[in-house]
Amino acid sequence: MREYKAIFICILICNVFVCPKSFGQTDYTYEKGKSFKNTNALSMTDTIDLTSISSPIPYKKSIPGQTQTIACPVRLLGYVRGIFFSRDSRPGDFEWPNNTNRLLPWVFNDLKELTDTRYPGIPSNAAPSTLGDALLLELTNGEYLFAKAIAGRNSLSWLQVNDNGSVTLYVSTLGKDYLKPEVPLLLIRQGKDIYSTIRQAYQALMKNTEAADLKSRTAKEYFEAFRYLGWCTWEHYHDDINESKVINDMKTIEASGIPIRYVLIDDGHLAHKNRQLTDFIPDKQRFPSGWKKIMSYKKENKIKWIGLWYSLSGYWMGLSPENGFPQVVRQALYPHAGSLLPGTDSTRIRSFYRYYVSTLKEQGFDFLKVDNQAFTLPLYMGGHESIRQATDCNRSLEAETHRQNMGLMNCMAQNVINTDHTSYSNSTRVSIDYKKYDEDMAKSHLFQSYTNTLLLGQTVWPDHDMFHSCDTVCGTLMARSKAISGGPVYLSDAPRDFIKENIFPLIDEQGKLFRPEAPAVPMPESILTNPLWSGKAYRVAAPSGNGAMTLICYNLNVSPRHQQVQAIIKKRRLFSSEQF
């Protein structure tokens, strides 16, 4: 049996610290284009030394009073190569911690490559953000190291890659509050096997109720509808939907002979003003009958379930002051940075989400796709208890959808607060949106989806996004990845355009998906490579049951020099069942 050990971080806390410059409170109010790189912080003299031994979740103690943010230099072990997980970054755009669906795997041999303008990166995305949430290293001794940022009760850590390739760990309240004297720093694990190293790190995280509210994927129920084929309005209509379009498409779906069992109504139905939600009823001009007519098309053996899209904070920019909520709900809201938000205490936040979920359930919906989750923290930033309140939003949504037996798809939920608080839900998007006819983006999508599943797949089934079966460029590519993902599979073609050859291999006669025992992940030789530029085949695998596995060898290279690659498969034992 292989032995695995936790990396320990021995942090000797002194009463001496270095403040690089005198500064007042930092304004952490979030704005598009605002970066928190090299943010004002109290520089701690003690290095986080990854060569020493301690617990998988070390704490920093004796933090001086009236400190918003600390910065801790990190001493890395010798490494051969690795992956830094962060969003992409472009001037004037959203930045960390609004990771949306854009937590991307940036592969390197030396961390300073990520700060080089010549870094080849990932096609269809901008340059790597040097502020990120996780780090995976292959060490010179042949072992693997996994480190991940975590949240405390009102603190959040993140990793910053500096121009010289060094790493600094920051911990902050991201608001007007000061850090407690003791805060968790990060999650860390070292081991001989890359899969077990990551899995054991998450097992340690699940035991720490201050840093997370998590259960493993295998310990949670999987919502019944997601075991079947679905259809979503988004990629076909985007937000240009209305009552007649949805009803006509449901009729066409039923007549198509394809057993689609649920419909997901995406963005475009909400009542809002300036992208702030005004009520949990649909736009009256687009949906004059509310949801009653659409719900009448549910049938036990046809379209059995209907789901609805909303944002965690209401709509893209939160809740409107000009709303139609009952007075008791209004009392659970407060103004901050131009929006109304649930809060300020946990009881009020929970009462808002109780109303949120119950209102939509009463209207006939079976599950929710809750989007824009990573932007909830930015909406609270710059205020008091920003992290605690944003975390309470995720906790409350989880608790209420579970209590009211509503299914939940998580989307744009790739910051630490979102990923580490899926106590009941069992599906999260692992990638940027799929785009029709865009082969390079499809390749990037697959690379991100499979690599992120190494992390997120510990606690949820990965959602690889919807796809068009009629996509003549990427349709078959997408169909295969959905099949092996184990997560929800939902089409977004105009129903008249369905291509049965890309659909029927995924399902039985009742529309039930053929699913693997665990989600597909990259095989060992493919994990720490960038398959878009490697010149090699990219291999992923998932256990299929009875000791068998499903394997796909991709050519994801985008260079014309590698239009063909060779892959050799030999019959041998590739994985133990525990590795999945």
Regions found by a protein language model. Give the residues of each.
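Bacterial Sec-dependent N-terminal signal peptides
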Residues: 1-26
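N-terminal accessory beta-strand-rich subdomains and adjacent acidic, glycine-rich linkers
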Residues: 26-207
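Short glycine/proline-enriched loop/turn "hinge" motifs that connect secondary-structure elements
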Residues: 219-225, 542-544
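Aromatic-lined carbohydrate-binding/catalytic grooves of carbohydrate-active enzymes
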Residues: 224-387
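Short helix/loop capping segments that flank catalytic or ligand/cofactor-binding pockets
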Residues: 239-242, 273, 419, 492-494, ...
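Glycan-recognition surfaces
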Residues: 316-361, 395-500, 517-532
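Carbohydrate-binding surface patches
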Residues: 482-485, 490, 529-579
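Extended substrate-binding grooves/exosites of carbohydrate-active enzymes
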Residues: 502-515
